Amino acid sequence: MGVFNYEAETTSVIPAARLFKAFILDGNKLIPKVSPQAVSSVENVEGNGGPGTIKKITFSEGSPVKYVKERVEEIDHTNFKYNYTVIEGDVLGDKLEKVSHELKIVAAPGGGSIVKISSKFHAKGYHEVNAEEMKGAKEMAEKLLRAVESYLLAHTAEYN
């Protein structure tokens, strides 16, 4: 089994604490609301939202991915860090055993934030994961982040 790493970062005009609260802590409710064309539902199928919780994300009709199940590994409210592992779903295919993501939101100069994502793709057997496959996960996260960001810009009184 090989492990393939992918790192990316993006910026947001939303302050780190507010973005963490909306995107991570309330993502189960907010993401389907702000991006129904991509995600139809996010639900905890096991646990209360903390470490060990299993979440099921169901993607909207027409998406190449039907669903994924993620296990929450860590939520650090002080350092705005969220670690989770994709453990099930057609996104894994026959190449991947799991995908682990570490997401950290840090304050950026000027009041916005920097979102840093580090992903580890754990391949089954001798399969290899190419850059395009790894980039797809980042692009989906970026789209969801931008939808949350737009919502927060339009609803300035929420998630403060």
Curated annotation (Swiss-Prot):
Which Gene Ontology CC terms are recorded? cytoplasm; nucleus
Q: Name one GO molecular function term.
A: protein phosphatase inhibitor activity
Q: Could you tell me the keywords of this UniProt record?
A: Allergen, Pathogenesis-related protein, Plant defense
Q: Which InterPro entries match?
A: Bet_v_I/MLP, Bet_v_I_allergen, Plant_def-hormone_signal, START-like_dom_sf
Alphabetical list of CDD domains matching this protein? Bet_v1-like (cd07816)
Q: State whether keyword Glycoprotein applies.
A: no
- Which superkingdom is the protein from? Eukaryota
Pfam families to which the protein is assigned, alphabetical = Bet_v_1 (PF00407)
**Can you supply a Gene Ontology BP term from the record?**
abscisic acid-activated signaling pathway
For whether the record's keyword set contains Zinc-finger, the answer is no
Q: Which family would the database say this protein is a member of?
A: Belongs to the BetVI family.
Q: What is this protein called?
A: Major pollen allergen Car b 1 isoform 2
